[in-house]
């Protein structure tokens, strides 16, 4: 099966849809990375997806290496999830009242992550981190939060400073509209630098409510924590009476049955979850020690609420996803990530392109760099201008990678031999495009 067999022949319909969208939606998209700003070209408007395959409005099919930015570990339109969603929708879409399924999902999640004793369901990862930070401040009576450069915790004003994900993709230091007052109690430190954390606690320890960190960052590209880093954060926060918030929105229930906690079991005070836990529908959660969580209303004074929180259709999708994700699914995820990493490394090595392919379980990234990437500064110093030609060569061959050098690559358990043949066929051309790129290749 040659790469020309899968060449994308036309994107005319996607281009028209993007023009139409730009007339009614700012930038034509509802999340900035989707606009292809970092790579240029026409965003693909997807009309359907099954297994590991996406189909766009022009009928082009792509092997999916984004998986809706992480959630689709089973692949798209998995029968068990579709059946659960259909059954739930038949019984009503939203009630504004408690439902049995939200309790079932909460219990399923609590059973997988030992430090989580209570869980509150919300509608997005942003809501989860925002609420966790508010709760940490309410519980400790302190105001300051430490976050790390390159870690992204949703578009919460106080946490956008020097963030990853779309903020990194667009090259923004923060965002207009975030006031000095909103960010005044946020301390931003370099990632993987424990000495900076210790020094900051020595200076401000009595004012620090919490440290928030991605369990294993994936929003500046995949940049795993150094050995013992999260455990050291646990130790220093405990020493100073601050809370540790571990953001598992991306890693939770993806990199293992218990998320990053299953790989690096650090007993944080609070965790945030999203993506996989709702099976591709809008839902998220935060949870942790009962003593902390029971400060939430209606038991305590820290307020948090949401009209659609615990939505029965989203709960059904999440519960079906977690129950279908057995040991075989996680073995397939790991094997597929291994296979993809080998193909990437082989093609880039053959083309003479310096590269790093860091891993966080079955998540990975491609950095065009001679040296390992251990923090946001190193990620930004990589030769990211090589990424756009690399990306477009893959996309034109019917492979759908992340559209930014600063995003993670995700596999599903449904990624099959046909998809891998397509990826293997496309990579040599893509690697040569990266090799021939210059700084002027930026879109």
Curated annotation (Swiss-Prot):
Question: Which Gene3D superfamilies does the UniProt entry name for this protein?
Answer: Aspartate Aminotransferase, domain 1, Type I PLP-dependent aspartate aminotransferase-like (Major domain)
Q: Which reaction does it catalyse?
A: (S)-4-amino-5-oxopentanoate = 5-aminolevulinate
Q: Name one GO cellular component term.
A: cytoplasm
Alphabetically list the UniProt keywords. Cytoplasm, Isomerase, Porphyrin biosynthesis, Pyridoxal phosphate
Asked whether the UniProt record includes Cytoplasm among its keywords, one would answer: yes
At the top level, the lineage of the source is: Bacteria
GO molecular function annotations of the record? glutamate-1-semialdehyde 2,1-aminomutase activity; pyridoxal phosphate binding; transaminase activity
Residues that bear N6-(pyridoxal phosphate)lysine: 275
Q: Name one GO biological process term.
A: protoporphyrinogen IX biosynthetic process
Documented EC number(s): 5.4.3.8
What pathway or pathways are given for this protein in its record?
A: Porphyrin-containing compound metabolism; protoporphyrin-IX biosynthesis; 5-aminolevulinate from L-glutamyl-tRNA(Glu): step 2/2
Main EC class the enzyme belongs to: isomerase
Where is the protein found, in the record's own terms? Cytoplasm
Q: Which InterPro entries match?
A: 4pyrrol_synth_GluAld_NH2Trfase, Aminotrans_3, Aminotrans_3_PPA_site, PyrdxlP-dep_Trfase, PyrdxlP-dep_Trfase_major, PyrdxlP-dep_Trfase_small
Subunit and interaction comment? Homodimer.
Family that this chain belongs to: Belongs to the class-III pyridoxal-phosphate-dependent aminotransferase family. HemL subfamily.
Q: Which NCBIfam families match?
A: hemL, PRK00062.1
* Record-given protein name: Glutamate-1-semialdehyde 2,1-aminomutase
What organism is the protein native to? Mycobacterium marinum (strain ATCC BAA-535 / M)
Task: Print the organism lineage.
Answer: Bacteria, Bacillati, Actinomycetota, Actinomycetes, Mycobacteriales
Q: Which gene encodes it?
A: hemL
């Amino acid at each position: 099966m040659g790469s020309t067999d899968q060449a994308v022949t036309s994107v005319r319909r996607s281009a028209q849809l993007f023009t139409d969208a730009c007339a009614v939606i700012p930038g034509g998209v509802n999340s900035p990375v989707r606009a292809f700003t970092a790579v240029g070209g026409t965003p693909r408007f997807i009309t359907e997806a099954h297994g590991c395959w996406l189909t766009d409005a022009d009928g082009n099919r792509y092997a999916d290496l984004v998986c809706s930015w992480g959630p689709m570990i089973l692949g798209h339109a998995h029968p068990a999830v579709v059946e659960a969603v259909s059954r739930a929708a038949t019984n009503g879409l939203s009630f504004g009242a408690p439902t049995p399924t939200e309790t079932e999902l909460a219990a399923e999640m609590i059973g997988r992550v030992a430090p989580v004793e209570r869980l509150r369901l919300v509608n997005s990862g942003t809501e989860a981190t925002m609420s966790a930070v508010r709760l940490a401040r309410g519980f400790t009576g302190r105001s300051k939060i430490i976050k790390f450069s390159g870690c992204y915790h949703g578009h919460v004003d106080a946490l956008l400073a020097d963030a990853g994900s779309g903020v990194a993709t667009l090259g923004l230091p923060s965002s207009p509209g975030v006031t000095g007052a909103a960010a005044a109690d946020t301390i931003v430190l370099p990632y993987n630098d424990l000495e900076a954390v210790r020094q900051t606690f020595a200076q401000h320890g009595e004012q620090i409510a919490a440290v928030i960190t991605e369990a294993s960052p994936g929003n500046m590209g995949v940049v795993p924590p150094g050995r013992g880093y999260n455990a050291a954060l646990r130790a220093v926060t405990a020493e100073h009476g601050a809370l540790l918030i571990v953001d598992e929105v991306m890693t939770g229930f993806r990199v293992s049955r218990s998320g990053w906690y299953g790989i690096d079991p650090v007993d944080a005070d609070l965790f945030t979850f999203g993506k996989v836990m709702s099976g591709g529908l809008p839902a998220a959660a935060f949870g942790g020690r009962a003593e902390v969580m029971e400060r939430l209303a209606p038991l305590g004074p820290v307020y948090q609420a949401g009209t659609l929180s615990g939505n029965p259709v989203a709960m059904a999708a999440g519960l079906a996803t977690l129950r279908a994700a057995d040991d075989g699914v996680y073995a397939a995820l790991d094997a597929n990530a291994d296979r993809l990493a080998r193909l990437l490394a082989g093609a880039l090595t053959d083309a003479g392109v310096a590269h790093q392919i860091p891993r966080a379980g079955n998540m990975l990234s491609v950095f065009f760099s001679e040296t390992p990437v251990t923090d946001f500064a190193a990620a930004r110093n990589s030769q990211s201008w090589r990424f756009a030609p690399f990306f477009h060569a893959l996309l034109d061959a019917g492979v759908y990678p992340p559209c930014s050098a600063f995003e993670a690559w995700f596999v599903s358990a449904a990624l099959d031999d046909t998809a891998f043949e397509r990826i293997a066929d496309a990579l040599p051309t893509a690697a040569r495009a990266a090799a021939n790129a210059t700084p002027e290749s930026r879109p």
